[in-house]
Amino acid sequence: MKKIAIIGAGISGLFIANLFKENPDYQITIYEKNTSINIDEGYGVQLSTNSIKLLNRIGFNTLEIKDKFNPEKIDFFVIKQEKKICDLNISEFNSEDCKYTTLKRSKLVEFLKDGLKDDIIKYDHNIEKIEKNNDQIDLSFNKNIKAICDYLIISDGVFSKGKSLISNNKIKPAYNNSIAIRGNISRNKIQNLNQNNISLFMGRNFHYVIYPVNKENEKLNFIGVLEYQLTANELDNYSLFKKKTFIQSIKDKLKNELSITILENIENIKCFPVFVSKGYLKPGKNIFLLGDAFFAFPPSFAQGASQSIEGASELFENIINNKNSFYDYRVAKVKMINNRSKLNHFAFHASNPIIIFFRNISLKLLTKNKKFLENYLGKIYKN
């Protein structure tokens, strides 16, 4: 029996553990640095059909209907006029069992966690050293805890300590000159929006998205991305982003970019600096990276969670079939999505009136062009 160690109990780590749990040839252990998994936050996540198909293999289709939502379209708006430009029918990529889905991230994590036995996840295990020892991998954690594995899967997020250890701290994420703003907003505070769809608003160096996270009458999810310069000292002071003064400064900056009705009614606001990957790391034999540890995308294509799931499925198939194609295939897919994310960011944040004019015309045409959509979205949404 081969031992698999997974560093990090995020979406990718939990999902691949669910795939391996029924295979008697492998023993899985997840090492999580925190003392528990936070399933209290109500912020949303979008899952396109490529990941729903994979999640259904472990019973996601049995999740209660009330706990998830299937939007049919993305409605595009210009912030200034609050004027709808066009819509994109994302349901065209749906099948009977695989539909574009939004839900609370905590609900997805809870589902993945509940699929595993309690003893699979070891909490309060902070990785400190990774060493290759012939065909085995030696792991050292805090409190002098040691472990040995045959395969090591590093899935501990964008600031991956595991990745830093195997790269000798040479590969780090880069600040993307933008702040992500998360929150919730009551349905009765929103007017002139189809609350059955995803609403995407484009502005000057800023865009935001509002969407439902379940079929109950709960608050809508709000996520905005604002271009914002930070000094090195500010980036090192992560507690800064939790301070009320900083959050208020962001809200003040948005007064000219966002309708007062929405701005004043966003609840549970949290701000995060957006970090992205700038390169790829190919680890040694039997060591793998997943999720944001593999590559962190700019948040303009809503593929972070879906790619964590898809990458985990690819790695699972590679390991059980003793293949070596995981890295090259994943890099090719990631490059495709990263390029689309950058293009989306440019389009959503355009400030030049001429560029905005042609962007709006292009959106009206391209959102109805099936050949374009099959190439731009179909290559991502279908696996």
Where are these regions (language model features)?
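Residues at the starts of beta-strands that form the adenosine-phosphate
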Residues: 3, 26-27, 219-221
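C-terminal auxiliary extensions adjacent to catalytic cores
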Residues: 360-383
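Conserved FAD/dinucleotide-binding core of flavoprotein oxidoreductases
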Residues: 86-100, 104-105, 109, 189-268
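Conserved N-terminal glycine-rich FAD pyrophosphate-binding loop of Rossmann-like flavoproteins
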Residues: 36-54
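Conserved Rossmann-like nucleotide-cofactor binding loop
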Residues: 12, 36, 159
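Conserved N-terminal helical subregion
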Residues: 4, 21, 48-186, 229-234, ...
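Glycine-rich FAD pyrophosphate-binding loop
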Residues: 21-41
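Conserved mid-domain beta->alpha element of the FAD-binding
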Residues: 5-21, 153-154, 181, 245-246, ...
